[in-house]
UniProtKB/Swiss-Prot annotation:
This is DNA topoisomerase 3. It comes from Shouchella clausii (strain KSM-K16) (Alkalihalobacillus clausii). The keyword Magnesium applies. Residues 680-708 are annotated as: Disordered. Its cofactor is Mg(2+). One of its GO terms (biological process) is DNA topological change. The gene is topB. It is an enzyme of class 5 (isomerase).
Length: 729
């Protein structure tokens, strides 16, 4: 009987599958037993060929050689992981293998990882698909009992390949055109560039904002009710005319208050929906300051290593109905401290609330919301970051077993000397889910109002006036930028409802799986920088937006592309038609860059020369500190000159910055505290209760000096040679 070759995305997942299936015999890059051979990729083992593969003229970056539009993009084996590719190829093509099971991540990119390997290895055997939302033993066993036909996912592969090819044609051509035209390390991409444009638009709105002073008026009665004045026609509470505000204050002081209406209604507030990836990234950024990338990395460990949560790269906040039968088992798995009391209360509620609030088949596509698995966990085995995220997921899950909270809202309108006064009160009737230790932030309940009826009269105790100023739009942080990428129409001035509809249907720009990487690329390309939690666009970022074609800056364009990729998944559009249009668009981008008369100017040039090529270095703010990088795109030299560490200032407890090189390195704080590195290390030895040791400082420095590894794509490989990051999604 022929054996089944199973292709996993990573060694850790392959080991889990092998253990569950009883594959104990070790081979070269595989595990075998019970009729299965489990092998694994290391992420992408195959990628698109570099431009020079299609002609020697493309080896050197020259504007006149653009655009590069190979008729067909060819696949090549990635050199660094070629050994594993050949091991996988050998397994897949063994004569005793009759069927291949794709067990890579259940999503578009996971499909691409596997299918590119199968294509490059010339595998022509029948394909089955393991499609599971968690990697617990139970999920793996159940998944292998109901393997899907691989043909069912061929359109998913077509969409993934179309996305990668579009990024090659548009990204590489646009990046080479900008870089060679302006002799600067510039890159553009169909997701990266519109995301940068969203930040730039907010920056411009803040710059143009002119604050306006205003007053609000409060009136307190002798029985303790506080009313607020409002314009009778517009209902606006702010008064922008100083003279009018003073006149109103005097007018209200000389009047009695007559109640015009008292309205009471019940407000039902359900628990917040379960987490999808974006919502969890936003919450983790807001609560703990984690970057989107940090959250995704910790989630991936919770999913793969701990088997604690379901598939993380999901865009759904609901469960499918077939998961209802697993809810009791999941409750049992989280019946440990600190959730035990909440679990006991949840069990008393039964499943009625959970079904009503969590289950919605229409809002689940490939993957359901993030929830705990059926496998019991120990928080002690998790890192601090992992435990915090796990707690958020579990508490949100448990909250949905409880009914909505109920409160009574009372709104009162009154007249005083012809002016409208309003008061609001809120009384909690039933706590529902709010009565549990969910960890959610409760809305502050308004003060209670005494009983009142229409026609009641009240005496004025005092009339107060408060002054304020209108505020500019807030700066983006990583959490709010993720939200803007998900719903960019809310941040556009465009009145075209068709564009807004397209953005809504496409689910924004980028995907839940790629948005964190896009933000990281904006940092590593020095287009944005962080001050505190706020994001600022750099001079380089602003100039880039002046140099790229206007259409590439529009969120609508990339959203339209995402829609078309989804149509390819659904079988409603052909990949070839989409790619033909991407080639034409790449041509147009190059033509516009060539014709543009604008210039790029380095305004961060230092007096220090590059030790490798002699040109002056540029000073930039990286995500974790200041760096100096060579302005020459072919040199790529860079060094850290100041980096934010985890060490704390002994005076104000803020994070210290490590500056300088060699023996002259100094720790400095914004409060003015400074100490040499040697003194810092000596102080650490004397105080063992602190967290940073000499070894940790040195380890941290080494990590900071390592350049980030680029994604396995031809575009990324090209940009890596320049010290740039590509937009591969």
């Amino acid at each position: 009987m022929k054996k089944k070759a199973v292709l996993a995305e990573k060694p850790s997942v392959a080991r889990d599958i092998a253990r569950v299936l009883g594959c104990n015999q070790k081979g070269n890059g595989y595990l075998e037993g019970n009729g299965y051979i489990i092998t694994w990729a290391l992420g992408h083992l195959v990628t698109h060929a570099d431009p020079e593969h299609y002609g020697k003229q493309y080896k050197t970056w020259k504007l006149e050689e653009l655009p590069m539009l190979p008729k067909r993009l060819e696949l090549v084996v990635i050199k660094q992981t070629a050994k594993q590719f050949h091991a996988v190829k050998h397994v897949l093509n063994r004569q005793d293998v009759g069927e291949v099971v794709i067990a890579t991540d259940a999503g578009r990119e996971g499909e691409l990882v596997a299918r590119w390997i199968l294509e490059k290895a010339h595998v022509k055997k029948p394909v089955k698909r393991l499609w599971i939302s968690s990697v617990t033993d139970k999920a793996i066993k159940d998944g292998f009992k109901q393997l899907k036909d691989g043909k069912r996912y061929e359109t998913l592969y077509a969409a993934a390949a179309a996305r990668a090819e579009a990024d090659w044609y548009v990204g590489i051509n646009g990046t080479r055109a900008l870089t060679t035209k302006h002799n600067a390390q510039l890159s553009c991409g169909r997701v990266q560039t519109p995301t940068l444009a969203i930040l730039a638009d907010r920056e411009e709105a803040i710059r143009k904002f002119v604050p306006k002073p205003y007053h609000t008026i409060s009136v307190e009665t002798k029985d303790g009710v506080t009313f607020r004045w409002a314009d009778r026609r517009s209902k606006e509470e702010r008064i922008f005319d100083d003279k009018r505000a003073k006149t109103l204050q005097e007018k209200l002081q000389q009047s009695a208050i007559v109640i015009d209406s008292v309205n009471a209604k019940t407000k039902r507030t359900p628990p917040p929906p379960l987490y999808d990836l974006t919502e969890l990234q936003r919450e983790a950024n807001k609560r703990f300051g984690y970057s989107a990338k940090e959250t995704l990395a910790a989630l991936q460990r919770l999913y793969e290593q701990h088997k604690a949560v379901t598939y993380p790269r999901t865009d759904s906040r609901y469960l499918s109905s077939d998961l209802v039968e697993t809810l009791k088992e999941r409750l049992h798995a989280v019946d440990v401290q600190p959730f035990r009391k909440m679990v006991a209360n949840a069990k008393k509620q039964g499943l009625a609330n959970a079904k009503r609030q969590m289950v919605n088949d229409a809002k689940v596509s490939d993957h359901h919301a993030l929830i705990p698995t059926e496998q019991p966990q120990s928080a002690s085995a998790m890192s601090d970051k992992e435990a915090k995220l796990y707690h958020l997921i579990v508490r949100r899950f448990l909250a949905n077993f409880f009914p909505p909270s109920e409160s009574e809202l009372t709104s009162v309108e009154a007249t005083a000397n012809g002016e409208l006064l309003r008061a609001k009160g809120e009384r909690l009737v039933s706590a529902g889910w709010r009565g549990q230790e969910t960890g959610e932030e409760d809305e502050a309940l308004a003060r209670l109002l005494p009983a009142m009826s229409k026609g009641d009269k009240k005496a004025v105790k005092w009339v107060g006036m408060t002054q304020g100023k209108t505020s500019p739009p807030p700066r983006f942080n990583e959490g709010t930028l993720l939200a803007a990428m998900e719903k960019p129409a809310q941040h556009m001035e465009a009145k075209d409802e068709t564009i807004k509809k397209t953005l809504a249907q496409a689910g924004g720009i980028g995907t839940v799986a790629t948005r964190a990487d896009i933000i990281e690329k904006l940092f590593s390309s020095f287009y944005i920088e962080k001050k505190g939690k706020d994001l600022y666009i750099t001079s380089k970022g602003k100039q880039l937006l002046e140099l790229v074609p206007a259409e590439l800056k529009s969120p609508a364009l990339t959203a339209e592309w995402e829609q078309r990729l989804e149509k390819i998944v659904q079988g409603k559009e052909q990949k070839q038609m989409f790619i033909a249009e991407m080639k034409e668009y790449a041509k147009a981008v190059v033509a516009q860059v060539k014709a543009d008369t604008a210039t790029f100017r380095h305004d961060n040039k230092t007096g220090e020369k590059c030790p490798e090529c002699g040109k002056f270095l540029l000073e930039v703010n990286g995500k974790k500190g200041k760096m100096r990088v060579c302005q020459d795109r072919e040199c790529g030299y860079r060094k850290n000159i100041a980096m934010t560490t985890n060490a704390r200032c002994p005076k104000c407890k803020k994070k210290l910055e490590l500056r300088g090189e060699g023996e002259g390195q100094v720790f400095a704080c914004v409060c003015g505290h400074r100490e040499k590195k040697a003194q810092f290390e000596q102080r650490r030895k004397q105080n063992k209760h602190k967290n940073v040791s000499k070894r940790e400082v040195q380890s941290y420095m080494k990590k900071q000096n390592k350049q980030d590894q680029f994604a396995n794509s031809a575009l990324a490989d090209q940009l890596a040679k320049l010290g740039l990051k590509g937009d591969d999604s």
